[in-house]
Every structure is written in structure tokens, then in C-alpha cells.
Regions:
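Short, small-residue-biased leader/transition segments that mark boundaries at the very start
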Residues: 3-4, 175
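Extended glycan-interaction surfaces of carbohydrate-active proteins
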Residues: 5, 10-55, 88-93
Length: 175
């Protein structure tokens, strides 16, 4: 069920609070990336990619987990979202021979990258709310259907400087 995507605060309460949820999310990235073959009888590509990514049990090639990195935003740990988002983009999206995940269900993997590179992500599609990530570009502008522009500025952005100090929308601080 995708109910937890619509109610991350409720998920946090069910897990015992923000600290407990943070520990569970952290463990996904630090647990050994061990696996069993299950009914397949062989290593499927999602498992091979999880092992190659070397981020614990986080299997980016398995689309239902891709939003999980952004759940840190909902518990007041946006720097962990920013760290892991950039790490996935650096390791899995590049021009080398292994620069793209082997699984692309309905454009989800590409959409994850496009949104993440812009610096925000729709944790629950269909809900007009976005979690903050780590933009790749120093500046980008989206031209909206109503003729307005939405501009993301990440001044000083670099591989080493990937963390957001503050985010403004209509002059209101959001981080």
C-alpha cells in the first residue's frame, strides 16, 4: 500500500517517532547488502545493482523504494536526503557503461533522476507537495503552463557543496 507515502508523519508515529524512523532509514543504507535468490534461483538485476551501488539494502533499481531517501525531509533530517540523493545520482547516473539502472518501469527511474537533479521530488504522486533534495545545477528555470517561471538557484553548488542552507518560495523560508 502507498498509504505511508501520503502520511509520512503517521508512518513516523507508527515507527515510534522521528528518532526511531531515522534509525530505520539509516539501517537501510548501512545494513550489509546480503541477499538470497528466493524463487528466482539466480541473482536478478535489482540485486546485482544493489550490490554494485554499495548503499546497504537500498536497491534503487527497485522503483518502490526510490522515494524512501526523501522521507528524511519529513523527520527534520534534510541533509541526509541531500547526501543520499546526490550519492545515488553520482553512482548510478553518468555517461559510463554502467551509468544507468537496468530497470525502467514506465519512466520512473528517469523521472526520479530528473526531479532529483532539479532539487525536489513528489514523494506521493498526485499530491501537490514536493520534498527537497540536492539540485545538480547552479540554476534552472521551469516555464509553467500559466506563463510564470519557477526558478531554482543553488549558488555555490558543487559535488562537495551539496547541502541546502535555506530554501525560499515566495520569500518564505522552507528549510
Amino acid at each position: 500500500s502507498d498509504v505511508y507515502k501520503r502520511q509520512p508523519e503517521g508512518l513516523s508515529r507508527l515507527m515510534g517517532g522521528h528518532t526511531a524512523m531515522e534509525a530505520r532509514l539509516d539501517s537501510m543504507f548501512t545494513a550489509p547488502n546480503t541477499y538470497n535468490y528466493g524463487t528466482y534461483g539466480f541473482v536478478i538485476h535489482e540485486i546485482a545493482e544493489m550490490v554494485a551501488l554499495d548503499m546497504g539494502q537500498y536497491a534503487h533499481g527497485n522503483q518502490p523504494v526510490q522515494h524512501a531517501i526523501y522521507l528524511y525531509d519529513y523527520i527534520g533530517r534534510p541533509w541526509k536526503t541531500q547526501k543520499h540523493v546526490r550519492e545515488v545520482m553520482d553512482k548510478l547516473y553518468h555517461s559510463g557503461s554502467k551509468g544507468y539502472c537496468g530497470d525502467e518501469d514506465n519512466g520512473q527511474t528517469s523521472a526520479w533522476y530528473v526531479f532529483s537533479a532539479m532539487g525536489f521530488y513528489p514523494v506521493c504522486p498526485g499530491v501537490p507537495e514536493y520534498a527537497m533534495g540536492s539540485p545538480l545545477f547552479p540554476k534552472l528555470t521551469l516555464h509553467l503552463p500559466d506563463g510564470k517561471n519557477f526558478t531554482v538557484k543553488a549558488e555555490g553548488n558543487s559535488p562537495a557543496n551539496r547541502y541546502i542552507g535555506k530554501a525560499l518560495l515566495l520569500s518564505l523560508i522552507h528549510i
